[in-house]
Amino acid sequence: MTVTVEPSITTGPIAGSSKAYREVAGPDGVTLRVPLRRVHLSTGADFDLYDTSGPYTDPNAVIDLAVGLPARPGLVRDRGTQLQRARAGEITAEMAFIAAREGMSAELVRDEVALGRAVIPANHNHPESEPMVIGKAFAVKVNANIGNSAVTSSIAEEVDKMVWATRWGADTIMDLSTGKNIHETREWILRNSPVPVGTVPIYQALEKVKGDPTELTWELYRDTVIEQCEQGVDYMTVHAGVLLRYVPLTAKRVTGIVSRGGSIMAAWCLAHHRESFLYTNFEELCDILARYDVTFSLGDGLRPGSIADANDAAQFAELRTLGELTKIAKAHGVQVMIEGPGHVPMHKIVENVRLEEELCEEAPFYTLGPLATDIAPAYDHITSAIGAAIIAQAGTAMLCYVTPKEHLGLPDRKDVKDGVIAYKIAAHAGDLAKGHPHAQERDNALSQARFEFRWNDQFALSLDPDTAREYHDETLPAEPAKTAHFCSMCGPKFCSMRITQDVRDYAAKHGLDSEEAIEAALEAGMAEKSAEFADHGNRVYLPITQ
């Protein structure tokens, strides 16, 4: 590492929980330590959660950013890609690790990878990463974009954002740096990232030619890809589907080509009036990525950047080409996922998933949102989380977060957290709707804590314990309020859950805590009213008494 950096990062357990590990047996006698976040409930029970924070939440870990994180056990460099090994029937250490993490069988993980419906982004040269899987049979994942720009940010800030994003649940990180020290920034992130790291190599290639797309060459791009593979990048966005003949299809769009990589390649194609060098050299690119087991993230360079442009001819023409490239990559043993839009109104979202599955052999779909409306700058983490939840339910495997700063500026630390939390909500909502076998367990645990007024347990089980506690304590800060049977919204007399508990307590006190007892009580009450009616002469109407 050639640049001196002293990042300030957040470490230590998340409130109400501790770092724990589950030991599982891996291949070749290797013991794997699978991380989890263990929530300690006031009932004395523990509740374990999927954890992406790496050693940064482990108080026993020694963190030295200049040295980087330790290598994972069981790493094998010379047996081919995860796809090739899965096809050969091998359950790798990464697959065994993932199976324990997801609560699934290792054979299911192997089978989904072998079929190309799931990917394990795990470059041989990124041993610091904890293995994870992206595929629709598993929990929906969330990616957080970080990276500097030519205008602002530093290496220290981007390392801090990486640690901060993974603390709150980012499953992967993309370093989209376009400013100074791109190589050094990526090196610091990779050596300290507990999750897979993705990049868009064309950005660094463009920086090497001083920002002039027309000066790009295949040789320059190829060398940049090799440089990043050597560093340990786990997956790469490659806009190989932007073809010369597709560029005119964007001419009448409201927002044209909004992908940075897509616009760079479109400019090169038009300047040279030749087919994209990413497309014409794709097989050589496959050979390079296969050597390191780097996963393709085939970029949607012609994605719609506005509601008006959703699902148009340009977008779907590129998707068909991505389907063609998917087959080529898999034939070379390279794992593939497909990037998707973008800006899409709700009623057009599912069509994107179904077409991607049809054209791309069900390769994992990785989508940016999509934003369901264009009218809310500063709130696009919300407009996009709406679309993200819908597309996750339909089968998207990973969601690329959008922050409140989208379309406005480079996100800071707070924006990163807001984006991650919004997308963890969307991903979890998608898992619930898909019927993921473990998704509802957390909802049930939190709902039970809510009904029993176990406030500290509610905070600890939530996606953001700090903010949940902060909001509660704004109006009821005293410690006894953590056991009170109300909050400041309804107060003690109008709390529906307290009233329901009172009703249940009354029922239990009077022996009405079973269906049979309630039925008997109803019959007794009806008999009492029948007798009262007879006592009044069986008259329907009685005289009014003063």
Curated annotation (Swiss-Prot):
HAMAP family: ThiC (MF_00089). It comes from Mycobacterium marinum (strain ATCC BAA-535 / M). It comes from the Bacteria. Pfam families: ThiC-associated, ThiC_Rad_SAM. Its EC number is 4.1.99.17. Substrate binds at residues 145, 174, 203, 239, 259-261, 300-303, 339, 366. Binds 1 [4Fe-4S] cluster per subunit. The cluster is coordinated with 3 cysteines and an exchangeable S-adenosyl-L-methionine. Belongs to the ThiC family. InterPro entries: ThiC, ThiC-associated_dom, ThiC/Bza_core_dom, ThiC/BzaA/B. This is Phosphomethylpyrimidine synthase. Catalyzes the synthesis of the hydroxymethylpyrimidine phosphate (HMP-P) moiety of thiamine from aminoimidazole ribotide (AIR) in a radical S-adenosyl-L-methionine (SAM)-dependent reaction. Pathway: Cofactor biosynthesis; thiamine diphosphate biosynthesis. Keywords: 4Fe-4S, Iron, Iron-sulfur, Lyase, Metal-binding, S-adenosyl-L-methionine, Thiamine biosynthesis, Zinc. It is an enzyme of class 4 (lyase). Zn(2+) binds at residues 343, 407. It catalyses: 5-amino-1-(5-phospho-beta-D-ribosyl)imidazole + S-adenosyl-L-methionine = 4-amino-2-methyl-5-(phosphooxymethyl)pyrimidine + CO + 5'-deoxyadenosine + formate + L-methionine + 3 H(+). [4Fe-4S] cluster binds at residues 487, 490, 495. One of its GO terms (biological process) is thiamine biosynthetic process. Gene3D superfamilies: 6.10.250.620, Radical SAM ThiC family, central domain (3.20.20.540). Its cofactor is [4Fe-4S] cluster. GO terms for cellular component: cytosol. GO terms for molecular function: 4 iron, 4 sulfur cluster binding; carbon-carbon lyase activity; zinc ion binding.
